[in-house]
Amino acid sequence: MLFRSKLEYVFINEDFEKKQDHKVLLEELENKNIKIYKTSNKIFSEMVDTENTQGILSVLRYKERDLVNNINQDNKFVLILDRIQDPGNMGTIIRTADSAGVDAIILLKGCVDIYNPKVIRSTMGSIFDMNIIQTTQDEAVDFLKANNFDIVSSYLHTESYYNETTYDGKIALVIGNEANGINDELISKSDKL
């Protein structure tokens, strides 16, 4: 699998190092010249924010992405997230988008930080594989419309349901805030509701 992030180094605790089935992973990391820092269980527990850890912590370099360089002519399905605030919801959306074959996720202002530990955990690794772009609403809408995407907003008050709509061509599906839905300006710029 090609990850969009570069693994810089890992920390492991004493318990992780002792387990025989972890030796293969540690050898692979060493073969790839990834630095491994060994810590006591006590120090490791102070580095993480969960009580029951697996004993390994990775540090990755994540490259910021822009629309122009990360959405291309081959992309057909993009997800736009408008002010998603719950970390668990964000992680689940990213994980689901990855498994559904979404080409990119666009995060608009007001979304929870995707580097929040709860977001990262709930993605179950998908965050490192997905093309995630943070940008403004105006920039996203202008770029997508210029590149022939239909902006389709999930909207409570509509005359057609998702299974009654055709999804030909390039689609940018908008999912709104848990409490307030999609903002009115984005609704007005949508091609379909």
What do the PLM-derived regions correspond to, one by one?
Residues 39, 61-65, 134-135, 154-160, ...:
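Short gly/ser/thr-rich secondary-structure transition/capping motifs
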Residues 153-193:
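Active-site/ligand-binding-proximal alpha/beta "capping" segment
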Residues 27-30, 54-56, 122-126, 168-172:
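Short, hinge-like loop/turn segments at secondary-structure boundaries
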Residues 21-25, 113-119, 180-189:
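Short, glycine/polar-rich helix-capping loops at beta-to-alpha or helix-loop-helix junctions
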Residues 3-9, 13-17, 28, 70-158:
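RNA substrate-binding interface of SAM-dependent RNA methyltransferases
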Residues 43-85:
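Hydrophobic alpha-helical segments and helix pairs
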Residues 1-49:
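N-terminal positively charged helical leader segments and presequences
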